[in-house]
């Protein structure tokens, strides 16, 4: 499992011109899965993200987690996090989980967040 995390003051996702999701202050999380991912790994990553102190406190220090600020999450499945361009000029996604498995892992990660 790979996660790419971005702090935001607001964010939204549009698909084919229709708003599918939006948040105010919080985190946008792009997550990708591989066939070797386990329940334990997902649980560990989810807990780590929830506890990361990446938001400023009143003194400007990064001392607060998304939980501390009661921030929101926008979670986007992103198989391209497992792209490889080691050979040739076309990305390979062999390391990415198959779509059905990835969807199940994505749903499992949502339950733990």
What is the role of each PLM region?
Residues 1-54:
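N-terminal structural module
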Residues 41-42, 46-89:
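Ordered, amphipathic secondary-structure segments that act as subunit-interaction surfaces
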Residues 86-101:
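A charged helix-plus-loop insertion that forms the helical arch/lid used to bind
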Residues 101-108:
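Structural signature of FAD isoalloxazine-binding scaffolds in flavoprotein oxidoreductases
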Residues 111-113:
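Conserved small/polar residues in nucleotide/adenosyl-binding loops
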